[in-house]
């Protein structure tokens, strides 16, 4: 049997201490990669918008680079004499690209802005352009990132028996680094340094990994290509499989036994399915666990960190407990089936059937068991797909590419197909069933399960592998899986079929339940609302869950993601009426965030051409729950509802307006809402105004006073004239800005708020008493708070909210050490007004 004498074989063995240093470098690389993912995704969202289609495009471009990079890295790993040196060069190249990429985003934004008007009516072509631009921006860097795992696998793997263990170490190290990057970036770095500087700190990590690898390579790979005698276990090569060839030797590939190819195809297929299910579950678990929390960045960071921790822990457990005898298709099948069962069990938490469970507890309980098995399965699959030590890098590259391909489809499937058809919990049941089926197939297909009960059959996999490997690592004992592997405890073919049938039965049960209307397939919010006895509607789209509560006017509510968005209130109607009172000659009105539709409806009542931009496609269709005459306004000739990202629309659209009203989704700290409060957005919004137009931004109460001043300071830094009005419904503050003076006069108030149609509209609310024209004149007079010079005296100097420093979203440490813990309300603002 031919033995490989490839000149690509690394010349030195990675000793335990050297291996520890290499793993530490890979931890740094993993941390940098996660920071890049956060920062670059945010930059691209600002370019393309926060719609599900745009986000899916970004994720696809990012992961496509990783997948193709892993394939290329696997090929290079099989031909490189110095894979550690090549790894170091790749890390330095990532650092160089990451340094330049922030500048490229600006050019990308300008290019997309120029293309958008001609493509906005052709969504298919627009999606293609988005994907092409996102791919051009991030794929070169992510391509290089994808190369790193195969290269280091090639460097560390010296014998076939240790392939899984080394891959487990590497996968655990990189995933642990990603978890560290998640926690440091989400909880510390972005708040302290901003997005741009945080990305440069990640560049420093790549530089450390790259330079460290090059230094190690000079010391330990310097002899590559020279003749070296095989040596023993203590840090040197042993056996002909590890001996480097002399100069000029013709590389001979080790023969791959016939039984191996079908097994590798099965492993690759299972890895593809696992990638699909895992990424889809991550999307759906995030939606399920974040429901009702307000969706702050700290919630998402915690979910992702626990997800990554479980994967890293699973890989470490594989490294600690795996044995060659247990590295079977059946073991991989058990892992996949276990993930399926545990995933299906999480819907009990997601439906609220166990009562109130603190967020961190339910996140750990839901994610940790399944993700540990995910982390265990990947290095196991890598070992099963590797025919020889020389092929380890290529096998891992192929495996990672298959996993990434499944992940891309999983992210699309979860958002665009599953959530909208089966709902969050139903989709989780379906995905769990899919993993169970995949696990059952692998379990039954394992040759070890086809031995007769009580008999021991020689393992064909091990026997063929031993024939190809004249030497083995004395540190890793071999065993006959017919007596010590899965075949022994499985008890033969009959029991194998029984276990496989049980897996399939659980899968079918989950698949059937996923399409039924059961308490376990409903979200926690829907179950809670149904118990009130009020009329409730529930829907899910690619963005979020949408629940409405009908009945008496005072109790009507709209909830998105389990969080109350708004209720029937005079404040939403006044957003249009007060803007019109400031500019009585206004003809056009732009509303950002549809909500119940109250502001949009009032704009049409005022006779304005009204455009409303809403991110969720489901929310506008719920307007009839709150307004009996909703159909008239939804189909009004002067009205237009645009399902899009409000920030993106303001930046790209060429229309101009006399009035703009922005009412971001609460809470004000939620991830995604901050982009409607930054200086850059306000500047773009100002550009959509005609001369003399008014821009209204809503600030809810229950915000720390210092944070409130930051918002006002940012707003006042963009608009030359600013006036703040305390809402009559006592829910928050209207901030009005313009390039012209802003003054309410009695005549315009009577004209806009005092006519019969306006009075009917404004008085049809449960949170404000019926008022006549004189009463509204007095209400507006009392509600005015600060303007221009007095306002600037109140806010003083200090930081503003920007895209790079999203201070309203990242606030943890600032609030932890905040001296003034006063939260704004009507009374606190009246006390704080300068005399």
Predicted regions and their residues:
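SAM/dcSAM-binding transferase cores
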Residues: 743-835
């Amino acid at each position: 049997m031919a033995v490989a004498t490839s000149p690509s074989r690394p010349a030195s063995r990675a000793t335990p201490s050297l291996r520890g240093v290499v793993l530490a470098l890979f931890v740094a690389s993993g941390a940098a990669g996660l920071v890049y993912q956060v920062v670059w995704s945010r930059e691209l969202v600002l370019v393309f918008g926060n719609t599900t289609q745009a986000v899916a495009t970004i994720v696809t471009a990012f992961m496509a680079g990783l997948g193709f990079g892993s394939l290329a890295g696997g090929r290079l790993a099989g031909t490189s004499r110095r894979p550690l040196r090549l790894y170091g060069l790749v890390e330095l190249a990532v650092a160089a690209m990451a340094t330049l990429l922030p500048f490229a985003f600006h050019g990308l934004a300008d290019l997309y802005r120029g293309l958008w008007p001609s493509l906005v009516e052709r969504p298919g072509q627009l999606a293609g352009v988005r994907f092409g631009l996102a791919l051009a921006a991030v794929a070169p860097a992510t391509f290089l990132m994808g190369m790193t795992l195969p290269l280091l696998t090639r460097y560390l793997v010296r014998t076939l028996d240790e392939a899984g263990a080394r891959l487990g170490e590497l996968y655990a190290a990189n995933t642990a680094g990603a978890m560290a990057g998640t926690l440091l970036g989400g909880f510390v770095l972005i708040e302290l340094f901003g997005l741009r500087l945080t990305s440069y700190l990640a560049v420093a990590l790549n530089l450390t990994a790259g330079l460290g690898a090059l230094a190690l390579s000079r010391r330990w790979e310097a002899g590559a290509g020279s003749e070296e005698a095989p040596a023993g276990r203590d840090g040197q090569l042993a056996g002909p499989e590890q001996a480097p060839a002399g100069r000029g030797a013709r590389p001979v590939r080790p023969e791959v036994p016939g039984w191996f190819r079908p097994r590798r195809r099965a492993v690759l297929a299972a890895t593809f399915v696992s990638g699909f299910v895992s990424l889809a579950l991550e999307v759906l678990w995030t939606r399920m666990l974040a429901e009702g929390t307000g969706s702050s960045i700290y919630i998402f960071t915690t979910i992702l960190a626990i997800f990554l921790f479980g994967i890293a822990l699973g890989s470490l457990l594989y490294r600690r407990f795996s044995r060659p005898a247990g590295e079977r298709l059946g073991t991989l099948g058990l892992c996949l089936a276990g993930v399926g069962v545990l995933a299906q069990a999480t819907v009990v938490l997601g439906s609220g059937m166990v009562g109130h469970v603190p967020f961190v507890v339910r996140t750990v309980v839901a994610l940790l068991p399944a993700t540990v098995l995910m982390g265990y399965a990947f290095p196991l699959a890598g070992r099963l797909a590797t025919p020889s030590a020389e092929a380890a890098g290529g096998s891992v590259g192929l495996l990672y590419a298959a996993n990434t391909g499944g992940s891309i489809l999983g992210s699309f499937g979860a958002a665009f197909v599953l959530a909208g058809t089966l709902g969050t919990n139903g989709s989780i049941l379906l995905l769990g069933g899919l993993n169970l089926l995949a696990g059952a197939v692998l379990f039954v297909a394992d040759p070890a399960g086809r031995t007769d009960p009580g008999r021991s059959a020689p393992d064909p996999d091990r026997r063929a592998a031993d024939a190809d490997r004249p030497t083995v690592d004395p540190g890793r004992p071999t065993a006959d899986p017919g007596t010590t592997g899965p075949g022994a405890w499985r008890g033969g073919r009959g029991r194998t079929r029984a276990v496989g049938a049980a897996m399939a039965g659980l899968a079918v049960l989950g698949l059937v339940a996923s399409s039924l209307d059961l308490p376990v397939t409903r979200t926690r919010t829907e179950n809670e609302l149904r118990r009130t006895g009020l009329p409730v509607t529930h829907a899910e789209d690619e963005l979020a869950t949408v629940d409405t509560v009908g009945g008496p006017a005072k109790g009507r509510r709209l909830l998105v993601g389990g969080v109350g968005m708004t209720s029937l209130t005079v404040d939403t109607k006044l957003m249009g009426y007060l803007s019109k009172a400031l500019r009585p000659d206004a003809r056009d009105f732009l509303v950002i965030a549809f909500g119940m539709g109250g502001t949009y409806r009032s704009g049409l009542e005022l006779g304005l051409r009204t455009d409303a931009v809403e991110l969720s496609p489901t929310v506008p269709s719920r307007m009839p729950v709150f307004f009996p005459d909703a159909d008239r306004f939804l189909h009004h000739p002067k009205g237009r509802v645009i399902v899009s990202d409000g920030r993106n629309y303001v930046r790209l659209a060429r229309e101009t307006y006399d009035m703009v009203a922005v009412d971001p989704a609460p809470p004000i700290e939620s991830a995604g809402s901050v982009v409607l409060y930054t200086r850059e957005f306000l500047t773009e919004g100002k550009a959509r105004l005609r001369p003399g137009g008014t821009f209204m931004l809503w600030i809810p109460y229950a915000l720390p006073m210092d944070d409130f001043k930051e918002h006002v300071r940012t707003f006042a830094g963009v608009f030359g004239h600013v006036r703040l009005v305390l809402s009559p419904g006592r829910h928050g503050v209207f901030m009005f800005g313009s390039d012209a003076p802003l003054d309410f006069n009695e005549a315009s108030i009577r004209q806009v708020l005092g006519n019969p149609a306006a009075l009917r509209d404004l008085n049809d609310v449960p949170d404000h008493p019926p008022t006549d024209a004189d009463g509204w004149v007095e209400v507006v007079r009392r509600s005015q708070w600060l303007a221009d010079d007095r306002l600037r005296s109140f806010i003083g100097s200090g930081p503003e909210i920007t895209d790079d420093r999203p201070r309203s979203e990242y606030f943890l440490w600032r609030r932890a050490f905040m001296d003034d813990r006063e939260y704004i309300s009507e009374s606190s603002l009246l006390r704080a007004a300068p005399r």
